[in-house]
A protein has these predicted regions:
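Short alpha-helical "packing" element that flanks the helix-turn-helix/winged-helix DNA-binding module
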Residues: 23-26, 419
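Interaction interfaces in information-processing and related assembly proteins
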Residues: 379, 386-405
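C-terminal accessory/connector segments of nucleic-acid motor ATPases
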Residues: 293-294, 396-460
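Alpha-helix N-cap and coil->helix boundary residues
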Residues: 2, 21-23, 428
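Alpha-helix N-cap/N′ positions at the starts of helices
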Residues: 2, 159, 411-414
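Helicase motor core with emphasis on the C-terminal RecA-like subdomain
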Residues: 5-10, 18-21, 31-47, 54-58, ...
């Protein structure tokens, strides 16, 4: 068969009617043996870019296989499940199935597996390094969600990310390398290319704009001016401040319910909170609301793998419509009907914010993304990043910040400051976010809360 026919067959087997324009050239480059750096929005269909050539190569050269490195178990399980549903040979090697690791790798060596999904940590395991690295090499290595290499790849948090390039260099037959992400400012791109040892990679960039998303920021900053003028003791002022905080918290919960009913009734809802404790608090409140009973689940890294998998399955299948989660959830999760993404608290960086709002509107229909902004959140996040939380409060730390060095703290605080500056600007929120991500020619979206406010000022 001709290569064109083999690719067409692969496209059909994967269930696609046809490839999108933005997918064709990256696929051609991989088929030609060229490294690629693909930067595209979450709804672009990046998985097809490595799945199509992976199937085509296996057809042309039986025994060829693709190694896909993912940051989270949820993403691995989702990818493997989707491929198996299409009768495509896919497997995973994670800490969960390490006991069967030898069997999985033996299947790969026999040519029985076309796609093997793993984590950076498992890639560095003795089993992997001895059974596959010396001889039975993949023809393609894919680093999915490649921004994690820069965001997470540190000596203290996930150092294995920094060893991926070294593992590739050890391989007897150097594979083609593909790095894919939706969020890579220029310094991220340089870091990814150098760390992975990519050879003259072809850059494929698709605009990160999402015209179907309506971006709204709600300011819940406490007005303490009245308290400051009260002729009462400091103790009484503190008590009044706590009452004001509690009232604001209840107002946020009421507004969250209103938004879920208004925008989320036609599909699914993801509600993000910064810490596990916040997730538990919001979840416990929402699940008791009469109009939401039986619809809400929670997800964070403090839960067992079995529990998280069950929750993920219920949400993806539509059995549960609303999920309250930390940043441990959502990266790469493909659920088309998410109509609302709500941040109950301030995210930690512009990159994290963009990644999470990218869960909404993947079907191309209008969706809303709402951020509850509060000065107290900034103080909380700064305190977390600066390491001022004590070890006994470790459960309150975001899932990605359980361990962090001083240099990493300073870098993370800079990212937080960039997000705060973005929220304080008088111009389009989406435009500012895209410019941070390197898309300098991004136009104003015309529909975010800032654009709407400016339009009202002009009387348009």
């Amino acid at each position: 068969m001709k290569t064109r026919d083999i690719v067409k067959e692969a496209v059909q087997k994967l269930g696609y009617k046809k490839l999108r324009k933005a997918q064709i050239q990256p696929i051609n480059d991989l088929m030609d043996g060229k490294d690629i750096l693909l930067i595209a929005p979450t709804s672009m269909g990046k998985s097809a870019v490595f799945q199509v050539p992976g199937l085509a190569q296996a057809k042309q050269k039986p025994g060829s296989w693709v190694l896909v490195i993912e940051p989270t178990l949820a993403l691995i399980h989702d990818q493997v499940r989707r491929l198996r549903e299409k009768s495509i040979s896919a497997a995973c090697l994670t800490g969960e199935n390490a006991g069967n690791g030898d069997d999985v790798l033996t299947q790969v060596r026999r040519g029985e597996i076309t796609f093997l999904f793993t984590t950076p940590e498992q890639l560095q395991s003795y089993r992997f390094q001895t059974m596959l690295v010396p001889n039975h090499n993949p023809w393609l290595v894919v680093v999915d969600e490649a921004h994690c290499l820069t965001e997470w790849g540190s000596f203290h948090f996930r150092p294995a990310y920094r060893s991926i390039g070294q593992t590739i260099q050890k391989m007897k037959h150097r594979p083609v390398v593909a790095a894919m992400t939706a969020t890579a400012p220029m310094r991220y791109r340089i870091d990814i290319v150098l760390s992975l040892g990519m050879k003259k990679p072809k850059l494929h960039y698709t605009s990160l704009a999402k015209p179907n998303l309506k971006l709204v920021v709600r300011d819940y900053t406490l007005d303490t001016s009245v308290l400051d003028s009260l002729p009462v003791s400091k103790r009484e002022k503190k008590r009044q401040l706590e009452k004001l905080r509690e009232k604001t918290l209840q107002n946020k919960l009421k507004e969250a319910v209103r938004l879920i009913k208004k925008y989320g009734s036609g599909g699914s809802v993801i509600l993000y909170a910064t810490t596990r404790n916040s997730v538990e608090f919001v979840y416990n409140n929402l699940k008791e609301r009469e109009e939401l009973k039986g619809q809400v689940v929670k997800y964070h890294s403090g839960m067992t793998a079995e529990k998280k998998n069950k929750v993920l399955g219920k949400f993806l299948s539509g059995k549960k419509r609303i999920i309250v989660a930390t940043s441990a959830f959502g990266m790469g999760i493909d659920k088309e009907d998410v109509r609302l993404v709500l941040h109950f608290e301030l995210p930690l960086s512009p990159v994290e914010w963009y990644q999470q709002i990218g869960r909404a509107g993947r079907d191309g229909r209008d969706a809303h993304v709402v951020l509850f902004y509060q000065e107290d959140d900034i103080k909380q996040n700064r305190a977390i990043l600066a390491g001022k939380k004590t070890m006994r409060e470790i459960e309150e730390l975001p899932d990605t910040l359980q361990s962090i060095t001083l240099d990493e703290i300073q870098t993370s605080v800079c990212k937080l400051e960039a997000l705060v500056d973005l929220l304080h600007q008088d111009s389009c929120l989406f435009q500012g976010l895209l410019r941070y991500l390197g898309e300098w020619n991004a136009p104003a979206c015309g529909c975010c809360s800032i654009c709407q406010r400016n339009r009202k000022k002009k009387g348009v």
